[in-house]
């Protein structure tokens, strides 16, 4: 049962040659060469497994080798292997001794990789409770930070009190920085070298690069005392030399006092940007930063004016290497710059610092809690040429591909990571890589070595009798011949080593470049695409032309580079059918009589003809209508000469056959309207000579002649009726008008009013007239008195 399951496993591994690119390509003559072709390939070391000189057949997929008869025990198919060397369980709860804390599992393993095969490992990380914390406070002491210095004079006590709630083992240290003490970053007059603030006037310390002032200690009062004694300094340009200070604080492990089993926090406090990389070339400093500790006996950075500022890449390497987590506490104006830095530096966070550093305590506590809520893996070591991919399984339990970071974790939660490793090719060297959580001292060490050799290579029969009386060494089922011999069993000597007999013509490659010349005969290579054959391996069954991506259009067989078409197909690609069925139009005529059938498609020859069967042709004559003159002549009863009808039919390209006995397999049914409005029907067929013959001429549905008397009577009656109707209408209109006038008169008469006492026509007999010259007596008197 176990053997059957193992066989099934190999069958699953053995994929199709055409899909994977093939194994038996004829180029693998040894087991090791076979394994290098691809992870799908295996080697059969069984003796006498292949035909004479068919060494390439030993290299194939496991399934194909089993099918060829190779026993399972002789199949060389190494797979990737994982050996866990150290796997201590993760720590749970508080640990009395920090050296006993285990935060990653496993701790070391050996990985053997078959090139092209992936191997997945599971790594678990759990942050332990009450983990020791080392905090180094790195402060910018340029003149603009004077008020901040006064604010943090009691920071040590307050910070220790707050951190005691999170860990019982807390230490803190202090360092400061300003700028490289060299022009153009500082003024160089003697007065300003001694006191950079002399122009204010105010006393401040000479410009310095970095000073390590207080090693890490649990004495908070000592921290407060050191801070109270600090003095500010000054420089010219706005960017400071903070990255110099970060580098020294990270790499000077002994001087700073970083512990191996603790969380290393570096709090960087500044209100300005920092120089980095080649900025120091402004001062003529061109020696790159070496990333080493250069603190002198006074704990000052001694190479400040000699080495360049570190680059971002150098900072990342040293911070990760020394497990230092960086907390940028910067003012609002600088937050955007340092957020960009933090995106590049693993484990770095950014907090907004108030103008006087009044919120520094809360900023540090918040940053610490944020760092403890995240678990991120970092890869170190020799990873060149190694393919690594990560899948994170955080507290939700849902796998997240291409992610090596878990956020919103609680202390004590376990974060799992599936790490998939693969080698693209076989490199004859082992490599050492490290997977570690950012900021933690724990790490997983992995020794990666390639698995490119076969177990059968360990058993070698030197000068074996299996190789023609000792003419070679027997290994992995084949003979490795001594110089001057060749062949499957080293049976060919120097006299048969000539390849001229294996060449099709002088100057041509041996066996056409597709086979091996063994003892004067070609043994063709095996190909995943088909068979190679011929005395010179000059033929194959897969190099013919393709039609629509298919060899010989899938309608023929390829023989020595030429398509041999199956029945019903022709053409160079076997893409041309000999059937004319697709070319027959609905009327049963090939290409509607307007084209030729080529490869099952109509090629229209008549101008204007189109369509799959040339059925559309606006400019072509109607085959039915073109026979009109012939048909009408045949049906005419006016005594036209029969010879004249024959001539008209000849002009129309047709003859009339009155016999009813004709083939009705294919015909065209026509219908025309004649001059006398009759419907004429007839059939068109083609005789053996291809000429048109007219059959079954019928005339039907002829209209009857008109009845003239009835038409005249109807017209007369219609005229009479119209006259009567018009008279009636006139009479109605006149009557309506008269009635309207009478009504109007009656209305006016009813409105008239006459006086009843006097006849308006009567005149009296007496008339009275007035003399206009007569004046009354009194009026004359008045007029006279007025004049006087």
From Swiss-Prot:
Provide the binding site for Ca(2+) 2: 179, 235, 237, 239-240
Keyword terms of this UniProt record = Calcium, Cell adhesion, Cell junction, Cell membrane, Disulfide bond, EGF-like domain, Glycoprotein, Host cell receptor for virus entry, Host-virus interaction, Integrin, Magnesium, Membrane, Metal-binding, Receptor, Repeat, Signal, Transmembrane, Transmembrane helix
SUPFAM superfamilies assigned to the protein according to its UniProt record, in alphabetical order: EGF/Laminin, Integrin beta tail domain, Integrin domains, Plexin repeat, vWA-like
Q: Where does the record say carbohydrate is attached?
A: 48, 97, 260, 387, 418, 463, 471, 541, 575
Q: Which residues cross the membrane?
A: 710-730
Domain of life here?
A: Eukaryota
The cysteines covalently paired via disulfide bonds are 23-41, 31-454, 34-59, 44-70, 197-204, 252-293, 394-406, 426-452, 456-476, 467-479, 481-490, 492-519, 502-517, 511-522, 524-537, 539-560, 544-558, 552-563, 565-574, 576-599, 583-597, 591-602, 604-614, 617-620, 624-670, 630-649, 633-645, 678-702
Task: Show where the VWFA domain sits.
Answer: 131-371
Principal location listed in the UniProt entry:
membrane
Q: Which GO terms describe its cellular component?
A: cell surface; external side of plasma membrane; focal adhesion; integrin alphav-beta6 complex
| Binding residues annotated for Ca(2+) 1, in chain numbering | 144, 147-148, 271, 355
Region annotation Interaction with HAX1: where it falls in the sequence: 731-758
**What family does the Swiss-Prot or TrEMBL record give for this protein?**
Belongs to the integrin beta chain family.
| Name of the molecule in the record | Integrin beta-6
The species this protein was found in? Bos taurus (Bovine)
Give the organism's phylogenetic lineage.
Eukaryota, Metazoa, Chordata, Craniata, Vertebrata
């Amino acid at each position: 049962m176990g053997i059957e399951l193992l066989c099934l496993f190999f069958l699953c591994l053995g994929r199709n040659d055409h899909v994977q690119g093939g194994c038996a390509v004829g180029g693998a003559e040894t087991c090791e060469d076979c394994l290098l072709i691809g992870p799908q390939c295996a080697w059969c070391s069984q003796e006498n497994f292949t035909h004479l000189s068919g060494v390439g057949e030993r290299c194939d997929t496991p399934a194909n080798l089993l099918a060829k008869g190779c026993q399972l025990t002789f199949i060389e198919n190494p797979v990737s292997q994982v050996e866990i060397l150290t796997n201590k369980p993760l720590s749970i709860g508080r640990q009395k001794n920090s050296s006993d804390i285990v935060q990653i599992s496993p701790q070391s393993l050996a990985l053997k990789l078959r090139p092209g095969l992936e191997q997945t490992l599971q790594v678990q990380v759990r942050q332990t409770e009450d983990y020791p914390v080392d905090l180094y406070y790195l402060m910018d002491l340029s003149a603009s930070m004077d008020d901040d210095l006064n604010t943090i004079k009691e920071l040590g006590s307050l910070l220790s009190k707050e951190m005691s709630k999170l860990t019982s083992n807390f230490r803190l240290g202090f360092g400061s920085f300003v700028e490289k003490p060299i022009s153009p970053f500082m003024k160089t007059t003697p007065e300003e070298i001694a006191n950079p603030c002399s122009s204010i006037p105010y006393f401040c310390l000479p410009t310095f690069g970095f000073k390590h002032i207080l090693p890490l200690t649990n004495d908070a009062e000592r921290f407060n005392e050191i801070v109270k004694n600090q003095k500010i300094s000054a420089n010219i340009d706005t960017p400071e030399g903070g990255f110099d200070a970060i580098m020294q604080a990270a790499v000077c492990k002994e001087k700073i006092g970083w512990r191996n089993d603790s969380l290393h926090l570096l709090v960087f406090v500044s209100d300005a940007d920092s120089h980095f990389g080649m900025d120091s070339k402004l001062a003529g400093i061109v020696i790159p930063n070496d990333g080493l500790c250069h603190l002198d006996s006074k704990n000052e950075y001694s190479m400040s004016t000699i080495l360049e500022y570190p680059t971002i890449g150098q900072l990342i390497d040293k911070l990760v290497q020394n497990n230092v987590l960086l907390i940028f506490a910067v003012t609002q104006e600088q937050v955007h710059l340092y957020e960009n830095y933090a995106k590049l530096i693993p484990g770095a966070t950014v907090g907004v610092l108030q103008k006087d550093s009044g919120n520094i305590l809360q900023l540090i506590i918040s940053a610490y809690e944020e760092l403890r809520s995240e678990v991120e893996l970092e890869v170190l070591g020799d990873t060149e040429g190694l393919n690594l991919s990560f899948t994170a399984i955080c507290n939700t339990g849902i796998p997240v591909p291409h992610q090596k970071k878990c956020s919103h974790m609680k202390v004590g939660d376990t974060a799992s990571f599936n790490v998939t490793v693969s080698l693209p090719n076989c490199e004859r060297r082992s490599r050492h890589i490290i997977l570690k959580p950012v900021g933690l001292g724990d790490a997983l060490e992995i020794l990666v070595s390639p698995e490119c050799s076969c177990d059968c290579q360990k058993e070698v029969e030197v000068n074996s009798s299996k190789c023609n009386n000792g003419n070679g060494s027997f290994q992995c089922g084949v003979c490795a011949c001594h110089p001057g011999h060749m062949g499957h069993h080293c049976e060919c000597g120097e006299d048969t080593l000539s390849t001229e007999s294996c060449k099709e013509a002088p100057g041509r490659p041996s066996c056409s470049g597709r086979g091996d010349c063994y003892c004067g005969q070609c043994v063709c290579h095996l190909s995943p695409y088909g068979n190679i054959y011929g005395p010179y391996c000059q033929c194959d069954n897969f190099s013919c032309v393709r039609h629509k991506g298919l060899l010989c259009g899938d309608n023929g067989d390829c023989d020595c580079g030429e398509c041999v078409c199956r029945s019903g197909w022709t053409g160079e690609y076997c893409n041309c059918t000999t059937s004319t069925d697709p070319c027959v139009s609905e009327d049963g005529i090939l290409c509607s009589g307007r084209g030729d059938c080529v490869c099952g498609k109509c090629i229209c020859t008549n101008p204007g003809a189109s369509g799959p069967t040339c059925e559309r042709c606006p400019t072509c004559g109607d085959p039915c209508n073109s026979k009109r003159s012939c048909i009408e002549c045949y049906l005419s009863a006016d005594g036209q000469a029969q010879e004249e009808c024959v001539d008209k039919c000849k002009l129309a390209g047709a003859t009339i056959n009155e016999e009813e006995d004709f083939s009705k397999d294919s015909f065209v049914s026509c219908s025309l309207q004649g001059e006398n409005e009759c419907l004429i029907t007839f059939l068109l067929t083609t005789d053996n000579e291809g000429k048109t013959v007219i059959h079954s001429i019928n005339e039907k549905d002829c209209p009857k002649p008109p009845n003239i008397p009835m038409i005249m009577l109807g017209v007369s009656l219609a005229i009479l009726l119209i006259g009567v109707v018009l008279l009636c209408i006139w009479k109605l209109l006149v009557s309506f008008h008269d009635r309207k006038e009478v009504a109007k008169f009656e209305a006016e008469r009813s409105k008239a009013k006459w006086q009843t006492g006097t006849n308006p026509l009567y005149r009296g007999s007496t008339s009275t007239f007035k003399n206009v010259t007569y004046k009354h007596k009194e009026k004359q008197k008045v007029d006279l008195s007025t004049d006087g």
